[in-house]
Amino acid sequence: MKGLLQRVRSARVEVGTEVVGAIEQGILVLVGIEPQDTRASADKLLHKLLNYRVFSDVEGKMNLSLREVGGGLLLVSQFTLAADTKSGLRAGFSKAAPPALGAELFDYLLSQARIAHPTVAAGQFGADMQVHLINDGPVTFLFDT
């Protein structure tokens, strides 16, 4: 399972004209699910997202986690993170999980996040979404569990 974390001042996801998820300061995470991923992969990714130190302390060092700053978590499914881009000029998606598995694991990740953290929002799995964000830094990390 891949998670592309971006530290944001704010972010929102729209499907059509409807805002389906929004946060203020926090992290936006694009989530790519692969066929070999399991609930254990989701648990490992969630632990990293909530506890990885991406926010600055009073000395300006990235020393604080999402939990410590009380920021929002916005999860957005993105199957293109599992793309094979090594050859040619067109991505291959055979490394992406089938939609049923992807939906199941994304829903699991989201439900566990809502149990573990007070401010969680999400995009809509499988939808054509517009993601708006104000990067903070920018600070971006790629996790691969």
From Swiss-Prot:
Catalytic function, reaction form: glycyl-tRNA(Ala) + H2O = tRNA(Ala) + glycine + H(+); a D-aminoacyl-tRNA + H2O = a tRNA + a D-alpha-amino acid + H(+)
SUPFAM superfamilies: DTD-like
Hydrolase found in the keyword field: yes
Keywords: Cytoplasm, Hydrolase, RNA-binding, tRNA-binding
BP term (GO), one: D-amino acid catabolic process
Motif Gly-cisPro motif, important for rejection of L-amino acids: where in chain: 137-138
Listed name of the protein: D-aminoacyl-tRNA deacylase
Organism, as annotated: Pseudomonas syringae pv. syringae (strain B728a)
Gene that produces this protein: dtd
